[in-house]
């Protein structure tokens, strides 16, 4: 297969995956116990992300206090060595980060039970160490893991995934080379349902193809959810074993 051949006649992608295969997915929680109430580190393909959750805690300013629910903040820090697509205009990059933060806040405000934490603030800090496509989905997954580690109540997992459309073939969990060559969508899927908490369309996709793209994305997100659940269960078992050994 040619080095720049996105999808070969044999059905292989640039990294050797089939159209419906996920990238390598590794995650761990409670990675920064002294720096945050909840934390996670995850690698999805070449995406490497640290997520810290601080709170619920009392806000510094009374103006930030809501007597009926918690205030949720998200900050995204893109490291200079993360392969972030940088334009000559720093304003464009800043606007892109602001859009990501706004989308994440809106999504998790609907999934976190903020009403049971009135008069508090929950700060989510994300540090992107390296990225290689599908970054929004990876951010979603990192936040979900860190919130659960912090013991913050949510209605369900939210799992993120990207899907590209190459000609008429959907490609699951796209990397950056694939994203640059085709239209992509990012999904945030609630639990094992087909309910979407996020649908981000990066480019035009024919309506007659969209239903298939979404179905494949939802199925892929369910697999990501299972991988996150597996990590959480392993961590819980480890904690129980350590407690029993004392």
Curated annotation (Swiss-Prot):
It holds the Pfam family RNase_PH_C. GO terms for molecular function: RNA binding. One of its GO terms (cellular component) is nucleus. It is found in: Cytoplasm; Nucleus, Nucleolus. Keywords: Cytoplasm, Exosome, Nucleus, RNA-binding, rRNA processing. It comes from the Eukaryota. InterPro entries: ExoRNase_PH_dom1 (IPR001247), ExoRNase_PH_dom2 (IPR015847), ExoRNase_PH_dom2_sf (IPR036345), PNPase/RNase_PH_dom_sf (IPR027408), Ribosomal_Su5_D2-typ_SF (IPR020568), RNase_PH (IPR050080). GO terms for biological process: exonucleolytic trimming to generate mature 3'-end of 5.8S rRNA from tricistronic rRNA transcript (SSU-rRNA, 5.8S rRNA, LSU-rRNA); nuclear mRNA surveillance; nuclear polyadenylation-dependent CUT catabolic process; nuclear-transcribed mRNA catabolic process; nuclear-transcribed mRNA catabolic process, 3'-5' exonucleolytic nonsense-mediated decay; poly(A)-dependent snoRNA 3'-end processing; RNA catabolic process; RNA processing. Present with 5150 molecules/cell in log phase SD medium. Non-catalytic component of the RNA exosome complex which has 3'->5' exoribonuclease activity and participates in a multitude of cellular RNA processing and degradation events. In the nucleus, the RNA exosome complex is involved in proper maturation of stable RNA species such as rRNA, snRNA and snoRNA, in the elimination of RNA processing by-products and non-coding 'pervasive' transcripts, such as antisense RNA species and cryptic unstable transcripts (CUTs), and of mRNAs with processing defects, thereby limiting or excluding their export to the cytoplasm. Component of the RNA exosome complex. Specifically part of the catalytically inactive RNA exosome core complex (Exo-9) which may associate with the catalytic subunits RRP6 and DIS3 in cytoplasmic- and nuclear-specific RNA exosome complex forms. Exo-9 is formed by a hexameric base ring of RNase PH domain-containing subunits and a cap ring consisting of CSL4, RRP4 and RRP40. Belongs to the RNase PH family. This is Exosome complex component SKI6. It comes from Saccharomyces cerevisiae (strain ATCC 204508 / S288c). The gene is SKI6.
């Amino acid at each position: 297969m040619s080095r720049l051949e996105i999808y070969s006649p044999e059905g292989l992608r640039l990294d050797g995956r089939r159209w419906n295969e996920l990238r390598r997915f590794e995650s761990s929680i409670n990675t920064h116990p002294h720096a945050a109430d909840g934390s996670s580190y995850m690698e999805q393909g070449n995406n490497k992300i640290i997520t810290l959750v601080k709170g619920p805690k009392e806000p510094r300013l009374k103006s930030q206090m809501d007597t009926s629910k918690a205030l949720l903040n998200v900050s995204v820090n893109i490291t200079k060595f993360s392969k972030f697509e940088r334009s000559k205009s720093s304003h464009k990059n800043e606007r892109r980060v602001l859009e990501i933060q706004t989308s994440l806040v809106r999504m998790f405000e609907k999934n976190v039970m903020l009403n049971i934490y009135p008069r508090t603030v929950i700060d989510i800090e994300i540090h992107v160490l390296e990225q290689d496509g599908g970054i929004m989905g990876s951010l979603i997954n990192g936040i979900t893991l860190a919130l659960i580690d912090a013991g913050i109540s949510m209605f369900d997992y939210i799992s993120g995934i990207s899907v590209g459309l190459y000609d008429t073939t959907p490609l699951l969990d796209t990397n950056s080379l694939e994203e640059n060559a085709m239209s992509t969508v990012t999904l945030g899927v609630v639990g094992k349902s087909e309910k979407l908490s996020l649908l981000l369309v990066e480019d035009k996709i024919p309506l007659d193809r969209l239903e298939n793209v979404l179905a494949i994305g939802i199925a892929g997100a369910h697999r990501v959810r299972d991988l996150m659940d597996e990590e959480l269960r392993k961590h819980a078992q480890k904690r129980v074993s350590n407690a029993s050994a004392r």
